[in-house]
Amino acid sequence: MALRFPRFSQGLAQDPTTRRIWFGIATAHDFESHDDITEERLYQNIFASHFGQLAIIFLWTSGNLFHVAWQGNFESWVQDPLHVRPIAHAIWDPHFGQPAVEAFTRGGALGPVNIAYSGVYQWWYTIGLRTNEDLYTGALFLLFLSAISLIAGWLHLQPKWKPSVSWFKNAESRLNHHLSGLFGVSSLAWTGHLVHVAIPASRGEYVRWNNFLDVLPHPQGLGPLFTGQWNLYAQNPDSSSHLFGTAEGAGTAILTLLGGFHPQTQSLWLTDMAHHHLAIAFIFLVAGHMYRTNFGIGHSMKDLLDAHIPPGGRLGRGHKGLYDTINNSLHFQLGLALASLGVITSLVAQHMYSLPAYAFIAQDFTTQAALYTHHQYIAGFIMTGAFAHGAIFFIRDYNPEQNEDNVLARMLDHKEAIISHLSWASLFLGFHTLGLYVHNDVMLAFGTPEKQILIEPIFAQWIQSAHGKTSYGFDVLLSSTTGPAFNAGRSIWLPGWLNAVNENSNSLFLTIGPGDFLVHHAIALGLHTTTLILVKGALDARGSKLMPDKKDFGYSFPCDGPGRGGTCDISAWDAFYLAVFWMLNTIGWVTFYWHWKHITLWQGNVSQFNESSTYLMGWLRDYLWLNSSQLINGYNPFGMNSLSVWAWMFLFGHLVWATGFMFLISWRGYWQELIETLAWAHERTPLANLIRWRDKPVALSIVQARLVGLAHFSVGYIFTYAAFLIASTSGKFG
């Protein structure tokens, strides 16, 4: 018999129903469950797939560069970054009528185009790219890297080049390589690029390979480095009147600590960023030489962890046993990596708008909104994934004997206390926050707004003041001109920093009031509830009082039949599934808050946010309804405009989202009946019944239907908000 899909599971391949296809797709990447898998092949497959992933990333980024060079307007944007709309790529659509062609022909283009809201123009401009030729060169280089990655992936699957399991489990070598080789060297290389190419470009000097060795980044070259006069590199920075990209007002410094923003570009000083990357490079290059490999010196990770036994014995055996537990579990390692990456991605979202690194990006409001929202959603999915793999670790890889009385075992031993505390925090936050919102809502509805309960966030205001914000009147730390902290930084970074914090045109330490206090606690409710569901799912993954043998059923099971009532919805997968809804809900509140606060700031009517954000109807009417009105006006006598595509996407997003409920609310029996009726009709319809299928059609399993429903819910939710966000922002600010 010919091999049928899936080849990795002979049991599934012989299944006579459509379950073969869906289960095959569902388990395609679960290498551990495949036939004939060995630990060695598992590690090698994952290693090779990493190169495939890199190839895809390089190909994708190469495509960005190529399409902007081919169809964009980078060179004219460079001449006037604040007024020319950056073009992502052309739109080719044979169905377009003349009104559509006119509506989407903008940014100086000859035909319909998409505007770029990704910030790539600002990024490329900041790092020294200036011409389409530069972009083509970059695209070709990335294409080359993509090909190299594919070759490397293929190579490491060949018998002679397959790494051994011991190589994959050599923790110290991997740490040294990643810390020094990847983070350290790449940060140093980036410092070099900023100093040799980007900073000269910001001062009107065009450095490329042909003059790279002739143009000194600093008048004194390497002299100050070798004579120990490093402070010379910080002297004579760009002046506050510097015009970015020209020599006018430019200085000669390359590594500075100015603080604050470049007055014209509203972004961090390039020389500050070069200095930052040099410091990061130094730290990581040192860190990457700390672990014991070939020379018998340095730390051993196992010794480090085994030595971590807290004195007093109150935390048992501390970190004993953790080295082997982590080093032998890919799910544990993936969980740690995803947790770290998720937090970093969220930090990127927060810092990209408050401390913009790219020239002129702060004045491109739609791009700011899109990048914040994009990174927060990505962070949410990555963080929930961390807990999913944590749960799979507990089910598949955790060994109680190996971890007796260490911190991991103790987490499991007192999971009831952890879960109940999280539950208490969620309930407290939920009832109090909703209570305040509802009270205020009723007061507004009855025409007595003065009876609202409005709480000033005094602790947060105090923290902002400690960092130098003076408008609240707290005389503390950096907002106190007499304090030692103020005087210590006065001669270096502090003037630039204080200027940035107290200038109301940027997003650094926005002024906060009762509306912020309330939405902060609503977001805290969402974060704690999402965490509660995820933590409970992982800690109860092996078993609970209700179902002590849960680990024997695996990661995702629907129920243990009718014999044990109450075992439905308690698999670790079900916890992940529920948590994703809460994650999306929370990030919805986060992005609503960020976007509304910023559009009122950009429009100069902050009082709208301050007055309307303290009650629910304010959010519904003055944020959601008011800003979606352009997207829901249907056909009008003015015909098509450039927001029409977002109006369509807004509608389509709602459709996809609503489709999710079809899978979430009706289960197998309903679908099985429907499928059998459809199959009956098909077999009795002339012509149609000439088409037969080999697999008997059966309904999706409960778990699969939930996954399909969750996927539609998530995609529709994000599509809808993306269209709303981009249209409402670009409709106001271009």
From Swiss-Prot:
Cofactor binding: number and manner: P700 is a chlorophyll a/chlorophyll a' dimer, A0 is one or more chlorophyll a, A1 is one or both phylloquinones and FX is a shared 4Fe-4S iron-sulfur center.
UniProt keyword Iron-sulfur present: yes
Residue stretches spanning the membrane: 46-69, 135-158, 175-199, 273-291, 330-353, 369-395, 417-439, 517-535, 575-596, 643-665, 707-727
Location of this chain's protein in the cell: Plastid, Chloroplast thylakoid membrane
Keywords from the UniProt entry: 4Fe-4S, Chlorophyll, Chloroplast, Chromophore, Electron transport, Iron, Iron-sulfur, Magnesium, Membrane, Metal-binding, Oxidoreductase, Photosynthesis, Photosystem I, Plastid, Thylakoid, Transmembrane, Transmembrane helix, Transport
Main location: plastid
Keyword Transport appears in the UniProt entry: yes
Positions of chlorophyll a B3 binding: M662, Y670
Membrane topology: Multi-pass membrane protein
Binding site for [4Fe-4S] cluster: C559, C568
NCBIfam families, sorted: psaB
Name this protein carries in UniProt: Photosystem I P700 chlorophyll a apoprotein A2
